[in-house]
Amino acid sequence: MRDMRLLVCVLAALVLPVDAMAATYVVVIEQMRFDPPTLTVARGDRVVWINKDLFPHTATADANAFDSHDIAADASWNYEARETGRYAYSCKLHPTMHAVLNVR
């Protein structure tokens, strides 16, 4: 039993610092643009898209790595970056809106 408690404590010590180091980044959707248009984050970080326009938008990766579906006006959507790579994304409703999420 004592060994099991020690194992649980060691595992908790290994897991907790990773979560504590994760950062949150914000992409603002406004005036038919994603701001910033290019964002680089680390694996495990969270990205929040906030729609400040008066109509819905999406944040949809070209390779379907993520898809917010409709983000209503004054609403938000978040995504945890789990896989490294370069993710070009756009708004399905307004195809001229493009941006890039880099995950290191």
Question: PLM ranges: what are they?
Answer:
Residues 2, 10-11, 17-104:
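Extracytoplasmic copper-binding redox domains, predominantly the cupredoxin/blue-copper superfamily
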